[in-house]
Regions:
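N-terminal helical cap/lid subdomain that shapes the substrate entry/recognition surface
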Residues: 1-84, 103-105
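Small/polar loops that bind or transfer phosphate-bearing groups
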Residues: 7, 98-99, 157-158
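Short, flexible active-site loop motifs that bind/organize anionic cofactors or intermediates
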Residues: 24, 58, 72, 97, ...
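Short glycine/serine/threonine/alanine-rich loop segments
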Residues: 29, 63, 94, 148, ...
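Short, intrinsically disordered/low-complexity patches at protein termini
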Residues: 29-31, 56-59, 90-93, 121, ...
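Substrate-recognition element of Asp-dependent hydrolases with the DxDx(T/V) motif
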Residues: 63-77, 82-114, 120-126
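Asp-based, Mg2+/Mn2+-dependent phosphohydrolase catalytic module
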Residues: 87, 103-104, 108-211
Length: 211
Protein backbone atom coordinates (compact mmCIF):
# COMPACT_ATOMS: atom_id res chain seq x y z
CA UNK A 1 0.00 0.00 0.00
CA UNK A 2 2.60 2.55 1.12
CA UNK A 3 4.88 3.44 -1.75
CA UNK A 4 2.86 1.16 -4.01
CA UNK A 5 -0.66 2.57 -4.17
CA UNK A 6 -0.10 5.58 -1.91
CA UNK A 7 2.75 8.09 -2.07
CA UNK A 8 5.49 7.09 0.38
CA UNK A 9 6.25 10.78 0.92
CA UNK A 10 3.68 10.81 3.74
CA UNK A 11 5.29 7.97 5.68
CA UNK A 12 8.81 9.19 5.00
CA UNK A 13 7.95 12.66 6.25
CA UNK A 14 6.38 11.39 9.46
CA UNK A 15 9.07 8.83 10.30
CA UNK A 16 12.14 10.68 9.06
CA UNK A 17 11.27 14.26 10.00
CA UNK A 18 8.26 14.64 12.30
CA UNK A 19 9.16 11.76 14.61
CA UNK A 20 12.80 12.78 15.24
CA UNK A 21 11.67 16.36 15.95
CA UNK A 22 8.99 15.22 18.40
CA UNK A 23 11.37 12.69 19.99
CA UNK A 24 14.04 15.35 20.48
CA UNK A 25 11.55 17.66 22.16
CA UNK A 26 10.05 14.92 24.36
CA UNK A 27 13.44 13.73 25.61
CA UNK A 28 15.22 17.10 25.65
CA UNK A 29 17.98 16.13 23.23
CA UNK A 30 19.18 17.74 20.02
CA UNK A 31 17.63 16.79 16.70
CA UNK A 32 20.65 14.98 15.28
CA UNK A 33 21.01 12.81 18.38
CA UNK A 34 17.31 11.99 18.22
CA UNK A 35 17.51 11.10 14.54
CA UNK A 36 20.63 8.97 15.07
CA UNK A 37 19.07 7.07 17.99
CA UNK A 38 15.89 6.34 16.04
CA UNK A 39 17.71 5.26 12.89
CA UNK A 40 19.96 2.94 14.88
CA UNK A 41 16.99 1.26 16.54
CA UNK A 42 15.06 1.04 13.27
CA UNK A 43 18.00 -0.78 11.74
CA UNK A 44 18.10 -3.18 14.69
CA UNK A 45 14.48 -4.25 14.29
CA UNK A 46 14.10 -3.85 10.52
CA UNK A 47 12.19 -6.71 8.93
CA UNK A 48 10.30 -7.57 12.12
CA UNK A 49 6.66 -6.90 12.91
CA UNK A 50 7.72 -4.42 15.61
CA UNK A 51 9.33 -2.25 12.96
CA UNK A 52 5.87 -1.57 11.53
CA UNK A 53 3.93 -1.43 14.81
CA UNK A 54 2.47 1.85 16.06
CA UNK A 55 2.05 0.25 19.49
CA UNK A 56 5.72 -0.68 19.61
CA UNK A 57 6.91 2.79 18.61
CA UNK A 58 4.52 4.50 21.01
CA UNK A 59 5.99 2.47 23.87
CA UNK A 60 9.57 2.97 22.69
CA UNK A 61 9.41 6.71 22.03
CA UNK A 62 6.83 7.67 24.68
CA UNK A 63 5.02 9.57 21.92
CA UNK A 64 1.49 9.20 20.53
CA UNK A 65 2.36 7.78 17.12
CA UNK A 66 -1.25 7.81 15.93
CA UNK A 67 -1.66 11.52 16.67
CA UNK A 68 1.71 12.25 15.10
CA UNK A 69 0.49 10.65 11.88
CA UNK A 70 -2.80 12.54 12.02
CA UNK A 71 -0.88 15.80 11.92
CA UNK A 72 0.27 15.30 8.33
CA UNK A 73 -2.67 13.68 6.57
CA UNK A 74 -2.63 16.34 3.85
CA UNK A 75 0.36 14.41 2.44
CA UNK A 76 -1.69 11.24 1.87
CA UNK A 77 -2.11 10.88 -1.89
CA UNK A 78 -2.47 8.14 -4.48
CA UNK A 79 0.54 7.31 -6.60
CA UNK A 80 0.31 8.14 -10.34
CA UNK A 81 -2.42 6.06 -11.95
CA UNK A 82 -3.04 3.95 -8.84
CA UNK A 83 -6.67 4.88 -8.32
CA UNK A 84 -7.44 4.40 -12.01
CA UNK A 85 -5.71 1.03 -11.89
CA UNK A 86 -7.84 -0.14 -8.97
CA UNK A 87 -11.00 1.04 -10.73
CA UNK A 88 -9.91 -0.83 -13.86
CA UNK A 89 -9.28 -3.99 -11.83
CA UNK A 90 -12.74 -3.76 -10.29
CA UNK A 91 -14.39 -3.30 -13.69
CA UNK A 92 -12.42 -6.27 -14.98
CA UNK A 93 -13.66 -8.47 -12.11
CA UNK A 94 -10.14 -9.07 -10.87
CA UNK A 95 -9.78 -9.85 -7.17
CA UNK A 96 -7.66 -7.19 -5.49
CA UNK A 97 -6.05 -7.52 -2.08
CA UNK A 98 -4.02 -4.88 -0.29
CA UNK A 99 -1.42 -6.93 1.56
CA UNK A 100 0.43 -4.46 3.75
CA UNK A 101 2.85 -4.24 6.64
CA UNK A 102 1.05 -1.10 7.76
CA UNK A 103 -0.31 -1.16 11.30
CA UNK A 104 -4.14 -1.19 11.49
CA UNK A 105 -4.10 2.36 12.89
CA UNK A 106 -2.05 3.48 9.91
CA UNK A 107 -4.50 1.82 7.52
CA UNK A 108 -7.41 3.54 9.27
CA UNK A 109 -5.84 6.99 8.97
CA UNK A 110 -5.05 6.53 5.29
CA UNK A 111 -8.46 5.08 4.53
CA UNK A 112 -10.19 8.04 6.18
CA UNK A 113 -8.44 10.31 3.68
CA UNK A 114 -8.28 8.16 0.54
CA UNK A 115 -11.19 5.72 0.97
CA UNK A 116 -8.82 3.19 -0.53
CA UNK A 117 -10.53 0.19 1.07
CA UNK A 118 -13.62 0.79 -1.07
CA UNK A 119 -11.54 0.25 -4.21
CA UNK A 120 -10.35 -3.27 -3.36
CA UNK A 121 -11.85 -6.56 -2.25
CA UNK A 122 -9.77 -7.07 0.88
CA UNK A 123 -7.28 -5.19 3.06
CA UNK A 124 -4.91 -7.46 4.98
CA UNK A 125 -2.42 -6.20 7.54
CA UNK A 126 0.55 -8.39 8.40
CA UNK A 127 -0.23 -7.56 12.03
CA UNK A 128 -3.21 -9.93 11.74
CA UNK A 129 -0.69 -12.75 11.36
CA UNK A 130 1.94 -11.33 13.75
CA UNK A 131 4.59 -11.59 11.04
CA UNK A 132 5.64 -9.19 8.26
CA UNK A 133 5.49 -9.77 4.53
CA UNK A 134 9.21 -10.53 4.62
CA UNK A 135 8.29 -13.78 6.41
CA UNK A 136 7.06 -16.81 4.43
CA UNK A 137 4.40 -17.46 7.09
CA UNK A 138 2.60 -14.32 5.99
CA UNK A 139 2.13 -15.70 2.50
CA UNK A 140 0.99 -19.09 3.73
CA UNK A 141 -1.62 -17.45 5.94
CA UNK A 142 -2.74 -15.18 3.12
CA UNK A 143 -3.13 -18.12 0.74
CA UNK A 144 -5.16 -20.10 3.26
CA UNK A 145 -7.45 -17.20 4.16
CA UNK A 146 -8.08 -15.89 0.65
CA UNK A 147 -7.64 -18.97 -1.53
CA UNK A 148 -4.90 -17.36 -3.60
CA UNK A 149 -3.70 -19.10 -6.74
CA UNK A 150 -0.09 -17.96 -6.74
CA UNK A 151 0.47 -19.12 -10.31
CA UNK A 152 -2.12 -16.61 -11.54
CA UNK A 153 -1.31 -13.78 -9.14
CA UNK A 154 0.57 -10.53 -9.61
CA UNK A 155 2.17 -8.80 -6.63
CA UNK A 156 3.35 -5.20 -6.64
CA UNK A 157 5.58 -3.68 -3.95
CA UNK A 158 8.32 -1.11 -3.46
CA UNK A 159 10.41 -3.32 -1.18
CA UNK A 160 12.79 -5.84 -2.77
CA UNK A 161 13.06 -8.15 0.29
CA UNK A 162 9.26 -8.36 0.39
CA UNK A 163 9.19 -9.21 -3.30
CA UNK A 164 11.85 -11.85 -2.69
CA UNK A 165 9.56 -13.41 -0.09
CA UNK A 166 6.61 -13.28 -2.48
CA UNK A 167 8.64 -14.85 -5.27
CA UNK A 168 10.04 -17.56 -3.01
CA UNK A 169 6.51 -18.43 -1.93
CA UNK A 170 5.53 -18.92 -5.55
CA UNK A 171 3.77 -15.73 -6.63
CA UNK A 172 4.25 -15.85 -10.39
CA UNK A 173 4.44 -12.18 -11.30
CA UNK A 174 6.30 -9.66 -9.15
CA UNK A 175 6.69 -5.96 -10.00
CA UNK A 176 8.54 -3.21 -8.17
CA UNK A 177 7.69 0.50 -8.01
CA UNK A 178 10.60 2.63 -9.20
CA UNK A 179 9.51 5.86 -7.51
CA UNK A 180 7.55 5.12 -4.34
CA UNK A 181 8.19 8.61 -2.93
CA UNK A 182 7.15 11.45 -5.25
CA UNK A 183 9.73 13.74 -3.65
CA UNK A 184 12.66 11.47 -4.48
CA UNK A 185 14.17 10.39 -7.81
CA UNK A 186 13.39 7.11 -9.52
CA UNK A 187 15.36 4.10 -8.37
CA UNK A 188 17.43 2.29 -10.99
CA UNK A 189 19.00 -1.16 -11.36
CA UNK A 190 16.07 -2.77 -9.57
CA UNK A 191 15.88 -6.58 -9.22
CA UNK A 192 12.33 -6.91 -10.59
CA UNK A 193 10.42 -5.48 -13.56
CA UNK A 194 9.91 -1.85 -12.55
CA UNK A 195 7.37 0.89 -13.28
CA UNK A 196 6.38 4.33 -12.06
CA UNK A 197 2.93 5.22 -13.43
CA UNK A 198 0.37 2.41 -13.36
CA UNK A 199 -0.34 3.00 -17.04
CA UNK A 200 3.20 1.70 -17.61
CA UNK A 201 2.13 -1.84 -16.72
CA UNK A 202 -0.79 -2.02 -19.16
CA UNK A 203 1.21 -4.02 -21.65
CA UNK A 204 2.57 -6.24 -18.89
CA UNK A 205 -0.99 -7.06 -17.84
CA UNK A 206 -2.07 -7.46 -21.46
CA UNK A 207 -4.76 -4.83 -21.03
CA UNK A 208 -5.10 -1.09 -20.48
CA UNK A 209 -6.13 1.57 -18.02
CA UNK A 210 -6.44 5.32 -18.27
CA UNK A 211 -6.14 8.08 -15.70
Amino acid sequence: MDGTLLDLNYDNHVWNHALPAAYAQEHSINLEDARSALITHMQEIHGTIDFYSFNYWTAYTKLDIVELHRGYTELIEFRPGAKAFLNWAKRSNKTTIIATNAHPDSIKIKDEVSNISSLVDHVVSSHQYACPKENSSFWQNLKEDYDIDEKKSIFIDDNAPVLDSSKNFGIAYNLIVSRPDSQKPKKTDLPYPAFDHYADICEYLNDGISE
